Amino acid sequence: MNGMTDQMKDLIGMLPTAPTTYAQLVYNSELLDYQAEQVLLMGDSLTQISPEQMHIKVIDANRAALEAGAQSAMIGYKQLLLNEESLESGLTLLNAVYQSTQNQAANGLATQSQVLSARQQLESTQATKLTLTANEQKLRQTLCTMLGWKYDAVPEIRDVPAADLARIDGMNPEKDKQAAQDNNFTIRYNVLDLDNKDAGSVEYQNLQRTIKQEKEEVSSSLVNLYNDVLQKRNELQTAKAAYELEKTKMETAERKWQLGTIGRLEYMQQQNSLKTKEIAVKTGDLALFQAMETYDWAVKGNLKLSQ
């Protein structure tokens, strides 16, 4: 009995955790930021805002935010699809566990409590799958409307490009910080705003200090974003190594299965483990691609500052 319970825990423990709607949160955040920018603009005195400032605030900053938000939503959509694929593999395994537990219970080798536990795990994962599918459909509709389609359109959504490791070689926070500072929308706006202040006034001096602090924040943020890229690269390499090891285990399981030296559940467990490692590689690739895009967007000026 205890062996069966332990086996079930091992099998269930290999299933993926419930995913988050990361891309939806990103998109909502970008949309709220866009609306906030409009409110801030309305609160300013229009007589003190130059056409260049208005263009930066209304056009440049919001365009970049929406483009970056659409990219993040696309990446998040692909992540949801990967999570669905992982759940499908997990459901296949859990269904087999449930059927096996029922059979063992019929032969007096498992308790009704164990049967109930297996069924609850299966039903819980099925419910998660339904929620995930609903989130995927909602996010697809969001993507369609963001990109100019009707919400119920069915355009082909292709894969996100694979992360190009060569891009990392071209990243250098020390060299890129000048461009990031010069391009930053907040800094550009405030630099132009200096023209509206009386040189030597308290407001002028305060704004000068603010701009200096903002430039320092850009520099430190760029270093953090670069470090995140490196971390995501390491995580991807680790995931790839784990996947290669799991493929070797799968080959061994294949031979044992053909020889009849392992049971069906053990074989399915190895299949699910391989699928989990495969999806971890794809997830790591998406995460690295997102990290590189975030760094590049910061260099282009799309970096929110705390000032």
For the regions a protein language model found, what residue spans apply to each?
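Short, solvent-exposed, mixed-charge loop/turn linkers that connect secondary-structure elements
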Residues: 133-175, 292-307
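Polar, low-complexity export/assembly segments characteristic of proteins
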Residues: 177-181
